[in-house]
């Protein structure tokens, strides 16, 4: 994951 990425639709 890139830095500052918000885990929103992580399956």
UniProtKB/Swiss-Prot annotation:
PTM-bearing positions, type 4-hydroxyproline: 3
Keywords attached to this entry: Amphibian defense peptide, Bradykinin receptor impairing toxin, G-protein coupled receptor impairing toxin, Hydroxylation, Secreted, Sulfation, Toxin
Tissue distribution: Expressed by the skin glands.
Subcellular location: Secreted
Keyword hit for Oxidoreductase: no
Domain of life assignment: Eukaryota
Modified residues annotated as Sulfotyrosine in this record: 11
Cellular component, GO annotation: extracellular region
UniProt GO molecular function: toxin activity
GO BP terms: defense response
Summary of the function given for this chain in its UniProt record: May produce in vitro relaxation of rat arterial smooth muscle and constriction of intestinal smooth muscle. May target bradykinin receptors (BDKRB).
Family: Belongs to the bradykinin-related peptide family.
Protein name, as recorded: [Thr6]-phyllokinin
Taxonomic placement: Eukaryota, Metazoa, Chordata, Craniata, Vertebrata
